[in-house]
């Protein structure tokens, strides 16, 4: 069951660009910091935040790889 939820969350994030995911991550952190949520809601938000952070990092890693490849190709010429 947890694996199905994780898979659904990954699919949900797949369509988000870096900026969208980062904005949602910031909003998620703000909601958590504001408090007043139930334990279950807090955990769900925390899990979403972790998934968003990983998605953002993957986007940044991909951008870095593209830049590195472009620089390497330019240096070969």
Regions found by a protein language model. Name each.
Residues 1-9:
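N-terminal leader/presequence segments that are low-structure
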Residues 13-74:
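Amphipathic, hydrophobic secondary-structure cores in small proteins
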């Amino acid at each position: 069951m947890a694996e199905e939820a994780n898979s659904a969350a990954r699919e949900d994030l797949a369509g988000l660009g870096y900026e969208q995911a980062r904005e949602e991550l910031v909003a998620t952190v703000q909601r958590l910091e504001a408090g007043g949520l139930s334990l279950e809601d807090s955990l769900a938000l925390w899990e979403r935040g972790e998934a968003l952070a990983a998605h953002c990092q993957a986007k940044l890693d991909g951008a870095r790889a593209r830049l590195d490849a472009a620089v390497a190709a330019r240096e070969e010429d």
